[in-house]
Amino acid sequence: MQRFGLVILFSVLVSLVQARTYVVCAGISNYSGTGNDLRVSAYDAQAIDKIFQKNKYSESVCYTNANATTQNIIDAMDTMFVKADKDDVIMLYFSGHGIPGGMVCYDGFLYYSTIYQVMRKFNVRNKVIFVDACFAGKMRYSNQRDDRRSKENVMLFLSSRSTELSMETPRMTGFHNSLFTVFLERGLRGGADSDRNRTLTADELYTYVHVGVVNASGNRQHPVMWGKFNGNMPVIKW
């Protein structure tokens, strides 16, 4: 019995060591026309992509501006996430404009229902969506009366409540990212790894980013984490 228990423990530890993170990043600063442009969203996506590109346990792809179309993002998720095993992490990061129930790509809307349909195809335990957009909290709602999203095994980490703006950092600060992504990037680089075990969990990331954004914004922006997931879910490891 003792030997059997050791075998199980070893198998679990091996799976954690081998677990990988597969990421699709998208950010749009320059929308079609000029009235809807943002300053830093493309930089946001590139900053998060860079973290995972440099991480030996991760793979990432990034689309910005005119390349961040609805179909390109869907195709990228299909191509990237099919590589994931059951104990890996699949992740979508988006920075740009949002709408209730979805996000605004370069050429149209990408709804959460579509993202969930894509993620549902893959037998992966750990699924993550990061969204940096004004009124991001509204993005988990739609006009559909039969909303099954709360039953999905997906972690949503949104940059602000449904009534709040998601702030861009002032030009004079030297940062080229939004406030949420500044702290998300720092957290993913290791700042949020509170127990220093080189594995960052959902709870650790939420605590770090939420406290940082709330303090830096003067209590005007409050990131929210929502969904059906384990707080000990790994997000990235080093």
Which residues does each predicted region cover?
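Hydrophobic h-region of N-terminal signal peptides that target proteins for export
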Residues: 10-18
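Cysteine endopeptidase catalytic domains of the caspase/legumain-like
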Residues: 2-6, 18-238
